[in-house]
Amino acid sequence: MTIYNFSAGPALLPQDVLREAQRELTDWHGSGMSVMEMSHRGREFMSIHARAEADLRELLQIPDNYRVLFLQGGAHSQFSMVPMNLLRGKTTADYVITGHWGKVAIKEARCYGDMRIAATGEASGFNGIPPQSEWQPNPDAAYLHYVSNETIGGVQFPFIPESGVPLVCDMSSDFLSRPVDVSRFGLIFAGAQKNIGPAGLTLVIVREDLLGQTLPGTPTMFDYKIHADADSMYNTPPTYAIYMAGLVFQWLKDNGGVRGIQMRNEEKAGLLYHTIDSSDGFYRCPVDVECRSRMNVPFRLRTEVLEKRFVDEADMAGLLQLKGHRSVGGVRASIYNAMPFEGVKALVAFMAEFARRHG
């Protein structure tokens, strides 16, 4: 039986990447060492690190005036690092809240300043994104923060917001899933465990002119400039996670880049949403059509009892990790870059059969 893992994260990795890592596990390129054993300052790992950054820059066409940082601490650490580094003498910043992770981000940021909510989708139950014409930004804000894709609610921005201040985006769950104009952002960050690689690595892309103005008392490890000046080698980096991310970047390049993966993601999500919408109400997706996520697809059935049966039977059929987040319930299929089209086809076939038996 073929197994398909629909986990929201840590998520599945491309099979080609796993096989390559398996081949090189005990002997990387004839070095006699596993990447896990290498000195992070040795020439072998330095070449791995350099290629990973070069490939990422090529994939996203990152301008030269942006630094790429390979950090630790997960996206949670960025909820503090962003205000510590980007308030830059100001006392306030704006946050757009479209779900759980936006709420967590502003709660943490309020430890460091007067953070305002410029817009929120809470009134609609976080099932959509308020039109930007209704936002109330502060022109004196240090930055504007938003989450491009909310994994729990399945709400994804179909546009890059206009902003007169540095734009900060948490792209943890849709990084590299579609082309993005990096030059429109002051800072992008992403935890690795959804579209980049295994857990333990956090990527930051930051414009150089925003560096070097941290809040007084900022810990050294939370200073972007310290890491930028040391080329992400201020302390021992998560070497194996960087190596794995590099393999994922190579896999993306070999499979049409971000434009190619965007087309496949649209095809996968389109099939799944069509199945939901054409089920005569047996399955329901609560998210507004125009901002439905192509990464995380939440849906409900008529009763919680039926939802539990769906998840249990899917698990027995090799369709794993479909239970919705504990805060909202229901069912959620996470179909990140590495999910093959065959996995979504298997899921929709199961959905059709389940609806036939229980409809």
UniProtKB/Swiss-Prot annotation:
Residues that, per the record, bind pyridoxal 5'-phosphate: 101, 151, 170, 193, 235-236
Pathway assignment: Amino-acid biosynthesis; L-serine biosynthesis; L-serine from 3-phospho-D-glycerate: step 2/3; Cofactor biosynthesis; pyridoxine 5'-phosphate biosynthesis; pyridoxine 5'-phosphate from D-erythrose 4-phosphate: step 3/5
Tagged with keyword Transferase: yes
The reaction(s) this protein catalyses: O-phospho-L-serine + 2-oxoglutarate = 3-phosphooxypyruvate + L-glutamate; 4-(phosphooxy)-L-threonine + 2-oxoglutarate = (R)-3-hydroxy-2-oxo-4-phosphooxybutanoate + L-glutamate
InterPro entries the UniProt entry points to: Aminotrans_V_dom (IPR000192), Aminotrans_V_PyrdxlP_BS (IPR020578), Pser_aminoTfrase (IPR022278), PyrdxlP-dep_Trfase (IPR015424), PyrdxlP-dep_Trfase_major (IPR015421), PyrdxlP-dep_Trfase_small (IPR015422)
Job of this protein: Catalyzes the reversible conversion of 3-phosphohydroxypyruvate to phosphoserine and of 3-hydroxy-2-oxo-4-phosphonooxybutanoate to phosphohydroxythreonine.
Subcellular location: Cytoplasm
GO annotation, biological process: L-serine biosynthetic process; pyridoxine biosynthetic process
GO molecular function, one term: O-phospho-L-serine:2-oxoglutarate aminotransferase activity
Entry binding sites for L-glutamate: 41
The name this protein goes by in its record: Phosphoserine aminotransferase
E.C. numbers: 2.6.1.52
Family recorded in the similarity comment: Belongs to the class-V pyridoxal-phosphate-dependent aminotransferase family. SerC subfamily.
Taxonomic source organism: Laribacter hongkongensis (strain HLHK9)
Cofactor note: Binds 1 pyridoxal phosphate per subunit.
NCBIfam families the UniProt entry points to: PRK05355.1, serC_1
Subunit comment: Homodimer.
Residues found modified as N6-(pyridoxal phosphate)lysine: 194
Name of the encoding gene: serC
Entry superkingdom: Bacteria
Keywords from the UniProt entry: Amino-acid biosynthesis, Aminotransferase, Cytoplasm, Pyridoxal phosphate, Pyridoxine biosynthesis, Serine biosynthesis, Transferase
One cellular component (GO) term of this entry: cytoplasm
Pfam assignment, any one: Aminotran_5
